[in-house]
């Protein structure tokens, strides 16, 4: 997986992780991967719905020590 950018959204409450992710995904090229770090449990559903609506692909999502990690490939 070729991660070109990492967004640290830890400690932010909904909707800020999505707002910042929208902005960050706009700075990368189609096919590139954005890594997003978040602690808001609502992000699990939010990112899934957001990626689907934008045509982006969540390649992987994991949780380590309370930190959710999303790897999103831009459409």
Over which residues does each language-model region extend?
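C-terminal structural segments of small proteins and small subunits
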Residues: 48-75
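An N-terminal amphipathic alpha-helical segment
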Residues: 1-28
